[in-house]
Amino acid sequence: MLWFKNVMIYRLNRPIELSVEQIEQQLSAFAFTPCGSQDMAKSGWVPPMGAKSDALTHSIPGHVLLCLRKEEKILPSSVVKQELEGKISKLENDQSRKLRKTDKDALKDELLHQLMPRAFSRFGQTLLWLDLANDLVLVDAGSARKAEDCLAMLRKSIGSLPVVPLTMEKPIEMTLTEWVRSGEPAAGFAIQDEAELKVLLEEGGILRCKKQDLSSDEIAVHIEAGKLVTKLALDWRERVQFLLGDDGTVKRLKFSDTLREQNDDIDREDFAARFDADFLLMTGELTGLIAELIAGLGGEAPRQG
């Protein structure tokens, strides 16, 4: 299966009251269909197991995996600009007058309509994991905007999705700064060699460190001068490495070779069995990581609702 590369974590304010079968049924009304000749973009659900299954959900007890596909039509701006300039020039010569902005805008709309069937498509897929056992929704996305787009589609599909970003009681940057300053992260975590330090005042300085000893005097001087650690590379129990942001995002997930090879005894020809085992393994590891991360960061902020 496709292991998550990033995790945007959201807290469900109340449990999803649907069974896996009901989720499957409601997603089917929003299954992916390709763009028509005049569509700029379309999104819809596809089987997480790809061509190996028709099911729009893949589940193990307490956990459901979904996959959202998006198709975007791409028209190179240079092509549009060149063709539009040619049409504007011809019309202005024919009519012996300069076109107004409204005329140019109308001409551009007409041109886009004509060019759309010739546009090429860009496809993307995003995995979503419903952790029903812990009332979390996790999205394999590198940006909040991409994650929110996926959540909006899920909300539209199942009728309701009361989620908020997972939030800590204490500002994460304060905790990360203390970890680096003291050299003592929470139990189970080890500081790696990458960080971002920032002065939180407007137009404050930013220091990005890679392959650097974060326990050095140089880093200590920056912290003493008021910079806070806003991103920090961490290792969790020598099993998972990641970059934690002050907004709670977990990026650049890297699962250890030992972990990923754990299911190598399963015949790769048995795709479904291997997919199932990998999903079980990944959810188990990330559930443990997230639980220890929440505790290590001082606990979650009180839930609303």
UniProtKB/Swiss-Prot annotation:
PANTHER family: RECOMBINATION-ASSOCIATED PROTEIN RDGC (PTHR38103:SF1). InterPro entries: RdgC (IPR007476). It comes from Sodalis glossinidius (strain morsitans). GO terms for biological process: DNA recombination; regulation of DNA recombination. May be involved in recombination. The keyword ATP-binding does not apply. The gene is rdgC. The lineage of its organism: Bacteria, Pseudomonadati, Pseudomonadota, Gammaproteobacteria, Enterobacterales. HAMAP family: RdgC. One of its GO terms (cellular component) is cytoplasm. This is Recombination-associated protein RdgC. Keywords: Cytoplasm, DNA recombination.
